[in-house]
A protein has these predicted regions:
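PLP-dependent amino-acid enzyme catalytic core
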Residues: 8, 12-16, 21-529
Length: 529
């Protein structure tokens, strides 16, 4: 074995003589010493992976990003032989370098276990020529389970590593799915409390009931009179309130986040795109080195950013297709280079995408700017001040990896109905947006590469919208009657996550104005105003 220095990092290269000491799936290992993270708004703000996960959001308001994207450095062909746990370790160990092998494998084992209803964790279903990456087999039947099942373990391990003795307060804004997944992940986890804010009239009936029936002595769920952007902006203001941060610290608390602004949410999402490539290899749908295209229904930009990071690691991804609903601020950005949230806000049947401020786009903007923290901070200040910013032509030229499209409400419903009638496969509303966008993009571009469409939620989570799309006759039925009928026509059992809330009592009924969020946090923590 020999070591090669590279930009201050240690690259470990194994010779053939060393191969006998390694499992075949772990050859070509790259060990990185002190892989650091820095804020997108201040390059001098550098922390370790575990510190970034603990903090959630940088104190300067920026998001933590790795100083470099590590190469996967595994022969692509081996991915077809690896299970989800093995792929997760291969990815996480390259990003979270201050965690030991034992710590990471403990987190992975604890996260991806019987909470998922299939040993495969993430099945891939082929329908009408497309591969649907089913990310909804976890405890709350949405893709957020993929990262939020492991985040509590990463965070509590990080607290021990950094000798953090304060109680961690998880603040989360949700457009529907993150909230329940975070609550399920952190409920009754020692040393933590979790507060979730959601738009009272901006989530589905099932999403709301999943949250307001959540058990756990350390959980708090609060509806706000406003939309998701109001909730997310309110959480960011709380994070940036130095006086409140000091008050909490003196009371024995520290803030962190379960939103995808936390790098501990984002990195685990990279795993399933790497895994998807391996599954297509195993199925013989492509050969090692051949590309796959990826389509992601997109709101806060974290899920598609994870696919972009997978590509940067070396996974052969062709186009990254960003699918929007009628809140098409991202589609317009990719078309024009102008990000402008000054527009009407639409409540749609794909509520997890009803977002006009896509927080994770900042991580991409930072990369497009050549990792110029000052330039990025200026653009984000413009967004805060005027609601818009425009990137340079040089930055736009770096967006060639991406394509964009959007679906109206009518087009989304038609996609659900058409695919069901053609194949019997039922999509949720968000995945239907992605499926429609890809179908239109395919008609114009005639791709030869296979496509992976991120299927982000179970149709049972949006049964009313799904069933109404399939046939208008279902419009008058009660919510759980619709769920039972969906189970019948799709020939799929009602998920446990839905059965559990059928008769569950409401435990959280507080609704507030956005200006009352800080006081609500202090009240839950027992701190006087």
């Amino acid at each position: 074995m020999q070591s090669e220095g590279c930009n201050g990092l240690l690259r470990v290269v194994y010779s053939r003589e060393d191969e006998s000491h390694l499992k075949s799936k772990e050859k070509e290992w790259v060990a990185i010493m002190e892989w650091m993270y820095r804020s997108t708004r201040n390059a001098a703000n550098r922390v370790t992976a575990s510190q970034a996960i603990l903090q959630g959001l940088a104190e300067d308001g920026g998001l933590y990003v790795p100083e470099q994207i590590p190469a996967l450095d595994l022969p692509l062909a081996t991915l077809g032989e690896m299970n989800y746990h093995e792929v997760a370790y291969a990815v996480l160990s390259r990003f979270l370098t201050d965690y030991t092998e034992e710590e990471l494998k403990y987190c992975i084992r604890s996260a991806y276990d019987r909470k998922f209803d299939t040993e495969e964790i993430v099945p891939i279903r082929k329908a009408d020529g497309s591969f649907y990456l089913e990310l909804f087999h976890g405890a709350t039947i949405a893709f957020k389970d993929m990262a939020l099942s492991i985040l509590p373990y990463l965070m509590t391990t990080a607290a021990k590593k950094n000798h953090e003795d304060k109680e961690i307060v998880i603040l989360t804004a949700t457009s529907g799915d993150t909230g329940k997944a975070a609550l399920a992940g952190f409920a009754d986890v020692p040393g933590t409390r979790i507060i979730v804010f959601y738009p009272k009239d901006g989530v589905s009936a099932v999403q709301e009931k999943q949250m307001v029936t959540q058990k756990g002595k350390n959980t708090c769920v609060i509806g706000i009179r406003g939309n998701f952007d109001d909730a997310q902006s309110g959480v960011k203001r709380i994070f940036g309130d130095e006086a409140l941060r000091k008050e909490l610290s003196e009371a024995g608390f520290c803030f962190s986040s379960a939103n995808s602004i936390n790098i501990g949410r984002l990195v685990p999402q990279i795993v399933y795109y790497v895994y998807a490539y391996g599954r297509l290899l195993a199925k013989g749908e492509l050969q090692a080195g051949e590309e796959m295209n990826v389509v992601v229904p997109t709101g806060n930009f974290g899920n598609i950013l994870a696919a972009f990071y997978a590509k940067q690691m070396g996974i052969p991804v062709g186009k990254l297709i960003c699918a929007s609903n009628e809140n098409k601020v991202l589609y317009d950005f990719f078309q024009t280079g102008v990000y402008d949230r000054n527009r009407a806000f639409h409540l749609t049947t794909s509520p997890s995408m009803d977002i006009l401020i896509s927080s994770n786009l900042e991580r991409l903007i930072y990369r497009l700017s050549g990792e110029d923290a000052k330039k990025n901070a200026e653009l984000m200040q413009q967004l805060t001040g005027t609601g818009r910013y425009e990137i340079t032509d040089e930055m736009r030229a770096k967006l060639q990896d991406f394509a964009g499209g959007y679906a109206t409400e009518a087009e989304t419903a038609e996609e659900i109905r058409t695919l069901y009638e053609k194949t019997g496969y039922v999509l949720d509303t968000h995945t239907a947006v992605a499926s429609y966008v890809y179908r239109k993009w395919k008609e114009q571009n005639h791709p030869t590469a296979p496509v992976v469409i991120a299927s982000t939620a179970s149709p049972f989570k949006f049964a009313r919208s799904v069933m109404s799309a399939i046939d208008a006759k279902y419009a008058g039925m009660e919510d759980f009657a619709l769920i039972d009928e969906l189970s019948r026509i799709a020939n799929v059992p009602v998920p446990k996550a839905v059965e559990e809330i059928r008769n569950a009592p409401v435990l959280h009924d507080k609704v507030i104005e956005t200006g009352e969020m800080s006081d609500a946090v202090k009240s839950f923590l027992g701190i006087s105003k």
